[in-house]
């Protein structure tokens, strides 16, 4: 195993923390801004136990937004509430690693965060829009429980190996990725199982570059 070449991040609850919504998520923030929180919350409770039905949940949740102004929602959810320490950590990592977002959240937010932080890519789920309003249509790119498949695809496309990758996440749907990469780090962990599954726990986001450096030093001398 050699030095790491890439660091991939979860979005919701990891890079951004939308307070007052379930899982600090972009989905919840958009629903709140659009005034459909109650209906969206009911859908979440209905579909959350059904792991194989995430695509149906995305479709149904997106339909709630049909006709709502994208700009009015954007005014309420932006600038994205980056977690404390994110900018400092990314500044230390940028230029040294391929940096990207792999999220089952919303691309509207993931793309904005990617641009603001100067990351290399973002992969998330799309809410379609026409004439400045959400159409109610969606494009599923990252299943809640399918992040590992997306990471494998990115690794192949970029000429990397899974051992080259550090992954940073906060919830149980991140565990399948944590189990296959070279280094996994939990931050803002929402479940004890996440801390149990990962290689390292970051007490603060700004600790992540140091944890990566320690890992690489250990690998170099192993």
What are the functions of these language-model segments?
Residues 1-49:
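Active-site neighborhood of HAD-like aspartate-dependent phosphohydrolases
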Residues 2, 83-222:
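C-terminal cap/substrate-recognition subdomain and adjoining C-terminal extension
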Residues 19-22, 65, 78, 143:
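Catalytic cores of large soluble enzymes that bind and process phosphate-bearing ligands
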Residues 21, 36, 67, 127-129:
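Short connector loops/turns at beta-strand edges and beta->alpha or beta->beta junctions
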Residues 53-87:
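Metal-dependent phosphoesterase signature
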